[in-house]
């Protein structure tokens, strides 16, 4: 795995960050994380030549690695109120979003229901020498209560409605970035002020569904 990381990928990451900046991503920390993350190790080798295109790609198990713009946009939204000390990620998937988050906070807690994806993501994070990520094989709808509350929560698949457990695990003053919906999905920001949750709609998006229940 580590042999797949080299100078060429560093340059490719920098070019991708420049492209995302031209499309409106402005947070320096997010752009730096994108530039320093070898996206090609998070996709199947047969698709590595497309890794630095601004497009979603299949990673197996009916899942995808999100479009880099969406990864950057959601990360930027998480940081809008400052640097969170901890982040809960629902849907580890390829681990690419996880790798970006790990460069933006002290600790990432990531939940994935498909064990094979979790194993692969762990290998990629080790290859990047990122060690501030804890992973759980679990139902994303339930979050990770024992590790909360969380300054920020990001959901990388779309539930039909906002899971109540995630609202409960959001710290006072924290923010949740989540795509919601079935056929039509909207990216939302939910901020917590005591027992009050304020919701803001960002833009239309397209994600795989956040499946509750059985683990794979």
Swiss-Prot record:
SUPFAM superfamilies (alphabetical): S-adenosyl-L-methionine-dependent methyltransferases
Superkingdom of source: Bacteria
Protein name (Swiss-Prot/TrEMBL): Protein-L-isoaspartate O-methyltransferase
Gene name of this polypeptide: pcm
Keyword tags: Cytoplasm, Methyltransferase, S-adenosyl-L-methionine, Transferase
Database matches in Pfam families: PCMT
Any one of the GO CC terms: cytoplasm
Main location as per UniProt: cytoplasm
Catalysed reaction, written as an equation: [protein]-L-isoaspartate + S-adenosyl-L-methionine = [protein]-L-isoaspartate alpha-methyl ester + S-adenosyl-L-homocysteine
Subcellular location: Cytoplasm
């Amino acid at each position: 795995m580590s042999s797949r990381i080299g100078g060429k990928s560093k340059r490719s990451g920098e070019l991708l960050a420049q492209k995302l900046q031209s499309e409106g991503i402005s947070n320096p920390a997010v752009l730096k994380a994108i530039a320093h993350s070898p996206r090609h190790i998070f996709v199947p080798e047969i698709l590595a030549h497309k890794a630095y295109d601004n497009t979603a790609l299949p990673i197996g198990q009916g899942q995808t690695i999100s479009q880099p713009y969406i990864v950057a946009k959601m990360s930027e939204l998480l940081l809008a109120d400052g640097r969170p000390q901890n982040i809960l990620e629902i849907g580890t998937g390829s681990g690419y979003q996880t790798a970006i988050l790990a460069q933006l906070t002290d600790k990432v807690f990531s939940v994935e229901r498909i064990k094979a994806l979790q194993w692969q993501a762990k290998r990629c994070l080790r290859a990047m020498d990122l060690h501030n990520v804890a992973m759980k094989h679990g139902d994303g709808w339930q979050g990770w209560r024992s590790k909360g509350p969380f300054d920020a929560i990001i959901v990388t698949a779309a539930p039909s409605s906002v899971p109540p457990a995630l609202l409960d695990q959001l710290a006072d003053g924290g923010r949740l970035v989540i795509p919601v919906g079935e056929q039509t999905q909207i990216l939302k920001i939910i901020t917590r002020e005591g027992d009050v949750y304020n919701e803001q709609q960002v833009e239309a998006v397209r994600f795989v569904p956040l499946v509750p229940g059985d683990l794979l």
